[in-house]
Amino acid sequence: MKRFLASGFGVGLVWQNIFGNKKGGGTLAPLIFTVLVYFLNLNVLVLSILFVSLLLIYFYSVEDHYADEDPSWITLDEIVGMSLVSLASPSEMLPLIAGFLVFRASDILKQPKFVSQLEDYPGKLGVLNDDLGAGLLGLLSATIVHQVSLLTL
């Protein structure tokens, strides 16, 4: 059960088993989450509760011995990071897309530098921290896009 949860509710495991590729699950899992958030039209309160719940599930499900190596099938950390982004404007497509792109670029490239420095914490906290940092950048980007879109109405 813990492995299923840590894999982003199976997404990381399915991706790896079907495609035989260890790369890509970290993008697919938050993308699925983003599409669900948009189509379920969840409000910010529900998303805030979901964010905290996902954090708790992460700390429950990711074993410290997995976190030391950060296996690619663990994708719940990316979902947690993207859940931060979704708080900006969950029912608007453009802010979600902008936030997703900034989140993934920051997470993959480990830029700006503070995102990579957040990984220096030991164990599962280090694995999660870079996604939270990238999520904050995505949240900022999504918020800016949302605010600019309000000005153009």
Positions of predicted regions on the chain:
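Hydrophobic alpha-helical transmembrane segments
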Residues: M1-D68, I79-L153
